[in-house]
Amino acid sequence: MANAKKKKMTFMESLKAQFSTKSLVLIPIAVGINLIGGTLCSTLKLPLFLDMIGTIVIACLSGPWVSALCGLLTNVFLALVANPVYLPYSLVSIFCGLVTGYMVKAGLFKKIWGVILTWLACSLSITFSASLITIFVYGGATGVTGTSVVTATLIAATKDIVVSVFSSSMLENLIDKAIAFAIAYVIVKKIPRRFLSQYASDATDDDDED
């Protein structure tokens, strides 16, 4: 009966359900987590980003569109407090939130293999979108994090900007998102069930626990 009701839920009803009071409280917390990770990597020039941990967590707890908003707000704040370079990458963060959120909604966070599949899908989609922005907006490198050093090294070796940007972005995102998904998975699993919304309980609890 519950599944039948969920299938009949319209997009607007689903959107309204995602933006619950709990979700509105979680958004600034998730954005804060993203800002800490992103600012730290930017300041230390690390070849990582770590600015989507909160986005992944809230995708599990509240849904894809709340996660997309979290990603957008994160990049807007990073552009204001760290570097304007982050602003165009808002699209990447939104994409990450939607991809992760819908895969979580499909129940893929219930098992480790599903988490791995979600990580790979998110990493690949982010690599494609971020690489296009890096190439067409910034000419191949941004200089914000240590990732630009990797890209510059590959460009010097291959003499091909497109191949270099996509290759470095793929490597960096696989590593970065592996860390982000691992941390997010641990956080979500550590949250007591009574504090989870019905969405989070349905999307992340193991089937054998129901």
Language-model segments: what does each one mean?
Residues 2-61, 65-76, 84-86:
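Hydrophobic transmembrane alpha-helices
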Residues 71-79, 98-102, 106, 205-210:
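Extended, non-catalytic scaffold segments that flank or surround catalytic motifs
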Residues 2-36, 88-139, 185-189:
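Short helix-perturbing small/polar motifs within transmembrane alpha-helices
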Residues 74-81, 137, 141:
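Regular secondary-structure segments
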Residues 64-69, 73, 107-113, 161:
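Membrane-helix interface segments
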Residues 43-49, 86-88, 110-210:
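Membrane-embedded alpha-helical hairpins and interfacial helices in multi-pass inner-membrane proteins
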Residues 51, 55, 92-97, 180:
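Hydrophobic core segments of transmembrane alpha-helices in multi-pass, intramembrane catalytic enzymes
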